[in-house]
C-alpha cells in the first residue's frame, strides 16, 4: 500500500504540473478501479509529430532520463512474422507505442526532480510547437 501510494502521488504530481499542456495523455484513471501507477507514462499527441526515441534523446540532453513506452509484442524481433499479421489488428497499440515514453519514477524521486522533469517536457514540446 505504501509503494502504491507513493507511485500514485508521483502520477498526481506529474498530472498537476502538465495539466495545461494540450494533446498529451498520462495514465488514465479507471472508473471502476484504482490505477496502481507503477510506471507513469506520457503519450504525445499527433500534433507534436514526435516519436518516442526522439523525445528520449532530447530529454537526455536536458539530463532527464526516460524510457520507451511499451512496444507491442508482435513488433519485437523475437516474432518476425507477427507484425504483418497483428499490426492491422492492433492499430492503437502500434500508434501509441510510437509516441509514448515512460517518465522517471524511482521511489526516491523528489518533488523538485519532478518539477525539473516537467519543465523539460514543457521545453521539449514548446520547441516542437514553433
Functional labels for PLM-detected ranges:
Residues 1-130:
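PLP-dependent aminotransferase class I/II
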